[in-house]
Regions:
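Membrane-embedded multi-pass helical conduit in multi-pass membrane proteins
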Residues: 192-256
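Short aromatic/hydrophobic "clamp" motif used to bind/position activated sugar donors
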Residues: 37
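Glycine-rich, basic loop-to-helix element that forms the pyrophosphate-binding segment
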Residues: 15-32
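Acidic donor-binding/catalytic loop of UDP-sugar-dependent glycosyltransferases
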Residues: 42-56
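Catalytic donor/gating beta->alpha subdomain of glycosyltransferases that bind UDP-sugars
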Residues: 63-90, 120, 125-188
Length: 257
């Protein structure tokens, strides 16, 4: 498979010509000679450096969503790290489940494979004027064009990402994510976002809603990351409505993403 893939790792300030990550991706992918490109963030940790061909079957797929897991570098993660790990597990499992059913609502450019020509055709849809969000806008573009999107659950291809260690960095990232929401047009993404927003507003109005929400959330979390404790997941469930609304309002009113 390696002769069909080019690994693309954009680095800020190195190959972006001062124009941001999306321009760096465009330059690197344009220069690639293979049918597929494997996009990776420069700070991910791959489980294995040797990928067997049978573990990575991409033929016939235009976009392959690869798995991610969040792990702390610390033996005893901080409260902030524990909450991020629980949230990330839920997000990743939701990504997998919706993609398997043909209604993908999320993907991450930290670990993603795309057909080179399809990516280049979709570049104008990535909103180059917005510094981030290349992965989600790419997903929307591929879905709109009716291209084939698949998901891989192989442990061998799972990449590890690190949680933020400061509250400032955490909030900045969440507000960037929320700030892109008005640009989304895909009906699956909008429906999923509306359901999540409604459920959390209802929980704020009536805390007993957590009794209905939490079993589903905890199932998603444990299915993706069995190491997440009940206490971490429950704390996340309790504070999530407030946290989500702060991030959403803050993101929508930020002048810069």
């Amino acid at each position: 498979m390696h002769d069909q893939l080019t690994i693309i790792v954009p680095r800020r300030g190195i190959n972006d010509e001062g124009k941001g990550k999306k321009h760096a991706l465009y330059c690197l992918i344009s220069a690639a000679k293979t049918e597929y490109v494997w996009m990776q963030d420069d700070d991910i940790i791959l489980q294995s450096l040797e990928v067997k061909g049978e573990s990575l079957e991409v033929k016939g797929t235009d976009l392959l969503i690869l798995p991610l897991r969040m792990q702390s570098e610390n033996e005893k993660p901080s409260l902030l790290e524990l909450l991020q790990i629980a949230e990330y597990a839920a997000i990743q499992q939701l990504t997998i489940e919706t993609a398997k059913r043909g209604h993908a609502v999320m993907c991450s450019g930290a670990n993603l494979i795309a057909r080179r020509d399809r990516w280049l055709e979709s570049y104008p849809d990535l909103h180059p004027e917005i510094p981030s969000g290349d992965d989600m806008f790419l997903l929307e573009s591929f879905k709109r064009r009716g291209l084939k999107i698949d998901v891989c659950e192989s442990e061998q291809l799972t990449a590890v990402v690190r949680p933020h260690t400061s509250w400032r960095a955490f909030w900045q990232q969440r507000m960037r994510w929320a700030g892109k929401a008005p640009k989304y047009t895909d009906k699956d993404i909008l429906l999923c976002g509306a359901i999540v927003l409604l459920a959390n507003v209802l929980q704020l109005l009536c805390p007993l809603v957590l009794l209905v929400k939490f079993p589903l959330e905890y199932t998603l979390i444990k299915k993706r990351d069995a190491s997440v404790s009940l206490s971490s997941a429950l704390l996340l469930g309790l504070i999530y409505p407030i946290y989500m609304l702060i991030a959403l309002v803050g993101g929508l009113f930020r002048r810069q993403w």
